[in-house]
């Protein structure tokens, strides 16, 4: 049985909501038996409309996907070349691994002081010893913005002894 679920809260730019896709029979069964479906509230119409519009834009905007893939590859390559440990993948969420919670907090604070907003993640959000700075690349980022972020990461990484 193929069931796909997703969120409208991250990649789709919404604040809440999600979706499930499957064969019609599976969806009907979920509508009848799924406790989260039965005991939850409907999404506000404007959130649903924004989600539908985002899907429409994705379906017709191959250049955005291409730019996102290019930006992600550029960021991952440059950060790796600078000496950072980036969790492998091609997705635009690029975890910069630091492995130490206080270091991740300090690093995130220093980035903010440099004008770069990125969050330090550590236990219990991620497994113990897997602290990181979570970066999320966008098709809207310019090369100059990516370079600014990479340069700040590199300066702070040297300052804090990460690289």
Where are the language model's segments positioned?
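Active-site C-terminal subdomain of aminotransferase-like
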Residues: 1-90, 103
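Short, solvent-exposed amphipathic alpha-helical segments in soluble enzyme
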Residues: 21-23, 36, 110-113, 152
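Conserved PLP-binding catalytic core of the aspartate aminotransferase-like
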Residues: 66-115, 125, 129-130, 137-139
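PLP-dependent enzyme catalytic core of the Aspartate aminotransferase-like
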Residues: 113-116, 125-163
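Cytosolic Rossmann-like ligand/nucleotide-binding regulatory domains
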Residues: 121-122
């Amino acid at each position: 049985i193929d069931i796909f679920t997703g969120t409208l809260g991250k990649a789709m730019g919404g604040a809440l909501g999600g979706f499930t896709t499957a064969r019609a029979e599976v969806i009907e069964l979920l509508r009848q038996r799924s406790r989260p479906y039965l005991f939850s509230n409907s999404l506000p119409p404007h959130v649903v409309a924004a989600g539908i519009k985002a899907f429409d834009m994705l379906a017709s905007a191959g250049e955005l996907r291409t730019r996102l893939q290019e930006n992600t590859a550029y960021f991952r390559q440059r950060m790796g070349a600078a000496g950072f440990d980036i969790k492998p993948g091609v997705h635009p969420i690029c975890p910069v691994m630091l492995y130490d919670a206080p270091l991740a907090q300090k690093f995130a604070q220093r980035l903010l002081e440099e004008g770069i907003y990125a969050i330090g993640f550590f236990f219990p959000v991620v497994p113990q010893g897997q602290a990181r700075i979570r970066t999320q690349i966008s098709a809207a980022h310019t090369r100059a913005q990516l370079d600014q972020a990479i340069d700040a990461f590199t300066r702070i990484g040297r300052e804090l002894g990460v690289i």
